[in-house]
């Protein structure tokens, strides 16, 4: 009976390891930012290039560019709600709350007066 318990434990550990490996393989993300509050993101891609392409394709504003790559974390973007074509900030962090706070602080640092988080996204870890 003890041997069966060990077999189940080994099988369970193997499944957990497989899930972790698959999760790590899908941990690429990207954030693209454009003018007047435009943004796009792509998360949970196997390849960074695919995440970048998804972020760019979802960014509907002009002059979009990928500003950051996420690996098992979160990205946030804040804009001045009264002037979305003015100040903005973005951040990438392993924790959503920190990414949001940093993006807000950067928006205020660049002259925003009424900054709000416009977008956020986390990959499978976040």
Where are these regions (language model features)?
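Bacterial N-terminal signal peptides that target proteins for export
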Residues: 1-12
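Secreted/extracellular ectodomain signature
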Residues: 2, 24-126
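Bacterial N-terminal signal peptides
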Residues: 11-20
